[in-house]
Amino acid sequence: MVVNKGIRLLSTKAARFVPSGGVYPKGFVVGGIHCGVKKDGKSPDLAVLHNTFGQDANAAAVFTKNKFKAAPVQVSAATIKQKNGVGINSIIVNSGNANAVTGQKGMEDARAMAMVTDSVFGDHKDSTLVMSTGVIGNKLPIDNILSGIPKLESQVGDSHDHWLACANAICTTDTFPKLVSKSFEINGNTYTMAGVAKGAGMICPNMATLLGFFVTDAPVSAKALQQILSYATDRSFNSISVDGDMSTNDTIVAIANGAAGGDLIDNNSSCAESYFELQKEVTSFAQKLAQLVVRDGEGATKFITLKVKDALSYKDAKSIASSIANSSLFKTAMFGKDANWGRILCAIGYSDVSTAQSIIPDRTSVTFVPTDGSEPLPLLVDGEPESVDEARAAQILELEDLEIEIDLGTGGGQEAKFWTCDLSHEYVTINGDYRS
């Protein structure tokens, strides 16, 4: 197994989530190398993805909402807008330096990365999206990157090892590379999807410190792909939190090249069935990638699923789940294995919901749902506290995975899921030492 020596020590827990093989889309090659961005002189820090199919690919992207958008975010967003998502064939990524808050030079460097990638891989102008991740405020070692891009040409391929090398090359404080792949069927045609992501800290909704890209050989219009990606991201990468910080760089990109054939999937009525089937496939895929980011949360010992049900709206349900997920008091209680449901209620109470009827205290219930299949443990039922068996609660909190169900009892029937982790001493250590 290829392991990035520049990332935190690969733990036994994390190794469970690194695949030993995969299925990969037709017409794409990927790779990763060390070019000299990272200080240790050997860790992979430059990755590329390229469409080798005989026709241009379509792309969609979702970017950070942070006001201090990094140079690669601005450059990539402009490229997507200029081309309406059509004719995007490559992604170039460096790790170890965010190229954020780097002024005009940062913009020039991001554009240069795209131009050199276009040239090396034989694409027409403006065919490449750029991503960077790492320390904010430092200029890129751009000469190292630009001389490294041509070296990628001989290191790309479509094997599992190539995909794993690509996933490793985008890591920073991650403990393991995040790679997911799967095959699926639409209208009798078999398609494949594969993707990588990075992120372990500075993760919260609306695109935080994470990068991710996934590709498929299904034929999808750029407009349909953008709508599907936005829907999927809202229910995956924008439904996770590690520490509540939103980064300057985060980007999720989807690319479809149509190499597996079949009818074009568009967003019109004649394609409705295939459109919604693809939306389901992309959403579940994005959720798997996003959940790997949470599992690798800096210093995390628990993976927590928050399920809010019977809300008046999806927006209310997600807002409440997000409020709990970003509560430091809740997260530290989970690390301490303390069934302090008062912290959950507190976070529910100050969440940003739409109306006064969105939360009715005497209809609200909170339950621990064990992931080992044993009996759930009610903590609060219709606003009334239960007599909690602390020994049973402690038993549940010993599990690595935990689900907490919040039933709002509004009669609205809407629900949302959100994924988070606990907050530990190690999180402080990792981030206190980040630049050293």
UniProtKB/Swiss-Prot annotation:
Pfam families: ArgJ. The alpha and beta chains are autoproteolytically processed from a single precursor protein within the mitochondrion. The keyword Mitochondrion applies. The record marks A208, T209 as: Cleavage. InterPro entries: Arg_biosynth_ArgJ (IPR002813), ArgJ-like_dom_sf (IPR016117), ArgJ_beta_C (IPR042195). It is found in: Mitochondrion matrix. It catalyses: N(2)-acetyl-L-ornithine + L-glutamate = N-acetyl-L-glutamate + L-ornithine; L-glutamate + acetyl-CoA = N-acetyl-L-glutamate + CoA + H(+). This protein may be expected to contain an N-terminal transit peptide but none has been predicted. This is Arginine biosynthesis bifunctional protein ArgJ, mitochondrial.
